[in-house]
Amino acid sequence: MDVLGRHIIAELWECNLEKLNNIDFIRDTFVEAAVLAGAEVREVVFHPFAPYGISGVVIISESHLTIHSFPEHGYASIDVYTCGDKVDPNIAVKHIADALESSVGQFREIPRGMGPVNAKPIQKIK
């Protein structure tokens, strides 16, 4: 069955604590991951929290990559969602997990848009 998108949710544990709290490293890693996966980067926004932790998003033409890091737990919550078949989200997730030096990871891929994609809209989209 065809899907409109692929959404990978990654739970990364036992990550490098310093890297989880380094906004420049996280930002660069996520942009690299998007490019390596074949995506076109549109916007990049990352925000540090006090006393530690980072949340951020890389908006790609094909959807997005996000992170919420919890250095105090050695944990990062990662989402990589891609539309179409040009981008491989698994490449992005692997790059991120390797860069963060995660020794324990759980990954789940969710096919998106498998529902009634041929349904008629209730309203016309302008």
UniProtKB/Swiss-Prot annotation:
Enzyme class (EC, first level): lyase
Keyword Lyase appears in the UniProt entry: yes
Annotated site residues (Cleavage (non-hydrolytic)) in this chain: E62, S63
EC code: 4.1.1.50
Catalytic activity line of the entry: S-adenosyl-L-methionine + H(+) = S-adenosyl 3-(methylsulfanyl)propylamine + CO2
Pfam families: AdoMet_dc (PF02675)
Active site: S63 (schiff-base intermediate with substrate), H68 (proton acceptor), C83 (proton donor)
InterPro entries, alphabetized: AdoMetDC_C, AdoMetDC_fam_prok, AdoMetDC_N, S-AdoMet_deCO2ase_core, S-AdoMet_deCOase_pro-enz
One MF annotation (Gene Ontology) recorded for this entry: adenosylmethionine decarboxylase activity
Comment on bound cofactor: Binds 1 pyruvoyl group covalently per subunit.
The record's account of how the chain is modified after translation: Is synthesized initially as an inactive proenzyme. Formation of the active enzyme involves a self-maturation process in which the active site pyruvoyl group is generated from an internal serine residue via an autocatalytic post-translational modification. Two non-identical subunits are generated from the proenzyme in this reaction, and the pyruvate is formed at the N-terminus of the alpha chain, which is derived from the carboxyl end of the proenzyme.
Single GO cellular component term: cytosol
Cofactor: pyruvate
Pathway listed: Amine and polyamine biosynthesis; S-adenosylmethioninamine biosynthesis; S-adenosylmethioninamine from S-adenosyl-L-methionine: step 1/1
Modified residues (Pyruvic acid (Ser)): S63
Keywords: Autocatalytic cleavage, Decarboxylase, Lyase, Polyamine biosynthesis, Pyruvate, S-adenosyl-L-methionine, Schiff base, Spermidine biosynthesis, Zymogen
GO biological process: spermidine biosynthetic process
Superkingdom to which the source organism belongs: Bacteria
Recorded family membership: Belongs to the prokaryotic AdoMetDC family. Type 1 subfamily.
Oligomer and partners: Heterotetramer of two alpha and two beta chains arranged as a dimer of alpha/beta heterodimers.
NCBIfam families attached to this UniProt entry: SAM_DCase_Bsu (TIGR03330)
Role summary: Catalyzes the decarboxylation of S-adenosylmethionine to S-adenosylmethioninamine (dcAdoMet), the propylamine donor required for the synthesis of the polyamines spermine and spermidine from the diamine putrescine.
Name the record gives this protein: S-adenosylmethionine decarboxylase proenzyme
Organism: Oceanobacillus iheyensis (strain DSM 14371 / CIP 107618 / JCM 11309 / KCTC 3954 / HTE831)
Gene that specifies this protein: speH
